[in-house]
From Swiss-Prot:
Quaternary context: Heterohexadecamer of 8 large chains and 8 small chains.
Family to which the UniProt record says this protein belongs: Belongs to the RuBisCO large chain family. Type I subfamily.
Keyword tRNA processing carried by entry: no
Name of this chain's protein: Ribulose bisphosphate carboxylase large chain 1
Function as written in the Swiss-Prot or TrEMBL entry: RuBisCO catalyzes two reactions: the carboxylation of D-ribulose 1,5-bisphosphate, the primary event in carbon dioxide fixation, as well as the oxidative fragmentation of the pentose substrate. Both reactions occur simultaneously and in competition at the same active site.
EC number(s) given by UniProt: 4.1.1.39
Misc: The basic functional RuBisCO is composed of a large chain homodimer in a 'head-to-tail' conformation. In form I RuBisCO this homodimer is arranged in a barrel-like tetramer with the small subunits forming a tetrameric 'cap' on each end of the 'barrel'.
PROSITE patterns: RUBISCO_LARGE (PS00157)
Swiss-Prot/TrEMBL keywords: Calvin cycle, Carbon dioxide fixation, Lyase, Magnesium, Metal-binding, Monooxygenase, Oxidoreductase
UniProt remark on cofactor binding: Binds 1 Mg(2+) ion per subunit.
């Protein structure tokens, strides 16, 4: 039931097609009695109207401008199944604790969208409408994607289960590190970082988002040194290792060339950045599927439209799009690290990545039930300002199916890179052992780490160096229905 309970004002018959301007709610974009079909795509928008603009008219305008409307009545509407194709705003609620903001629920007929195309989907729901003058701000908070639509996508090419089988690693989070500094190293020194980190016990190393092919290190040079390091580390440890080789480039032809070279060298994983765009992401997903390659996505650029609470696109929506588009890894927040990440909201992101079905959970920012129709699961990645002393918190908040990326927390270790990797691996193994023994690893976490450090100098050093490091700031994007406590 609408909190703003205004009846339908739709004008029908010959009056609907008189020349001139008609309000959106009279044109049929406000239908409070509409019951969404199982096949409808539903969007939840946070609408902030300009002062003096009726919130229902603003919500109806969002529905209209993201589907079939233009600024005036057009006679060609009579040549279409207008009643079917018009998006329908059927509910408008004030946002709790946010004066002047409203949640607008809008249903779209499935036939408005091309099968299996994120670019087409986004061209409608985040196209022109975000620049509409009657709105101060607009944010796409969540979407319900019907099974009929989900099934038109291929999803992640590898998935969590097959990735673990390929790596032969089960029962614990995977460990990684982003090579630092992200820019400036020569290929040889870059490869040395990779080798020491993997030999010390990490499962993966990673290129950062902006390392592509620069004067100080050509991409081919980096790939060669990285894969030499991976192969030597595998031989030394007897474990399957990998390094996320960033194939992001100026053109698809360049990206395919780099990905093919990574495959020739024996890499199990390639990496792309979110900024390459939705079509390029889906294209690389198709390549990864054909070539049995894990596809890692760095969410570079996402905060330009996910960070602000009243305008843009929520990261939970980006996560849904990326699961459809088909990536195996996606950076999804750390809770305790240096980057934005409310605990409950981040849990919602992780659930979207890893669950077969997401029930509505307002406390996690999830507004709709979502059936993933057997699409593979994505492995979330936690990266940014985390270290071994937080291991119990990371496992508590993020669970087991996650890649924990300790970049500075490995490479910044006072005893060196390999020691940093050892510290992280020992901390993880100690915490997983305590968990499997049934201990309260969260409350006992510091003691568990201290005991492990007594026989592991690298871990002892890590705990000493980073013992006071926290990033305890108020989150800017928290659930609207729950007050989220700060993370210690």
């Amino acid at each position: 039931m609408n909190v703003l309970n205004e009846k339908s004002l739709t004008v029908r018959g010959k009056d609907r097609y008189k020349s001139g301007v008609m309000s959106y709610k009279k044109m049929g974009y406000w239908e409070p009695d509409y019951t969404p079909k199982d096949t409808d795509i539903i969007c939840l928008f946070r609408v902030t109207p300009q002062d003096g603009v009726d919130p229902i008219e603003a919500a109806a305008a969002v529905a209209g401008e993201s589907s079939t409307a233009t600024w005036t009545v057009v006679w060609t509407d009579r040549l279409t199944a207008a009643e079917k194709y018009r998006a329908k705003c059927y509910r408008v609620d004030p946002v709790p604790g946010a004066e002047g903001q409203y949640f607008a629920y809008i249903a779209y007929d499935l036939d408005l969208f091309e099968s299996g195309s994120i670019s087409n989907l986004t061209a409608s729901v985040i196209g022109n409408v975000f620049g509409f003058k009657p709105l101060k701000a607009l944010r796409l908070e969540d979407m319900r994607l019907p099974v009929a639509y989900v099934k038109t996508f291929k999803g992640p090419p590898t998935g969590i289960v097959v990735e673990r089988e390929r790596l032969d690693k089960f029962g614990r989070p995977l460990l990684g590190a982003t090579v630092k500094p992200k820019l400036g190293l020569s290929g040889r020194n870059y490869g040395r970082v990779v080798y020491e980190a993997l030999k010390g016990g990490l499962d993966f190393t990673k290129d950062d988002e902006n390392i592509n092919s620069q004067p100080f290190m050509h991409w081919r040079e980096r790939f060669l040194y990285c894969m030499e390091a991976v192969n030597r580390a595998q031989a030394a440890t007897g474990e399957v290792k990998g390094s996320y080789l960033n194939v992001t480039a100026a053109t698809m032809e360049d990206m395919y060339e780099r990905a093919e070279f990574a495959k020739e060298l024996g890499s199990v994983v390639v990496m792309i950045d979110l900024v390459i765009g939705y079509t390029a992401i889906q294209s690389m997903s198709n390549w990864a599927r054909k070539n049995d390659m894990i596809l890692h996505l760095h969410r570079a650029g996402h905060s330009t439209y996910t960070r602000q609470r009243n305008h843009g696109v929520s990261f939970r929506v980006i996560s849904k799009w990326m699961r459809l588009a088909g990536v195996d890894h996606i950076h999804a927040g750390t809770v305790v690290g240096k980057l934005e990440g409310d605990p409950l909201t981040t849990r919602g992101y992780y659930d979207i990545c890893r669950e077969e079905h997401n029930p509505m959970q307002l406390e996690h920012g999830i507004f709709f039930d979502q059936n993933w129709a057997s699409l593979n699961k994505m492995m979330p990645v936690a990266s940014g300002g985390i270290h071994a002393g937080q291991m119990h918190q990371l496992i508590q908040h993020l669970g087991e199916d996650v890649v924990l990326q300790f970049g500075g927390g490995t490479i910044g270790h006072p005893m060196g890179i390999q020691a940093g990797a050892i510290a992280n691996r020992v901390a993880l193994e100690a915490m997983i052992l305590a968990r499997n023994e049934g201990r309260d690893y969260v409350s006992e976490g510091p003691d568990i780490l201290a005991k492990a450090a007594a026989s592991c100098t690298p871990l002892k050093q890590a705990l000493e160096v980073w013992k006071d490091v926290t990033f305890n700031y108020q989150s800017t994007d928290a659930p609207d229905y729950v007050t989220t406590p700060a993370v210690a």
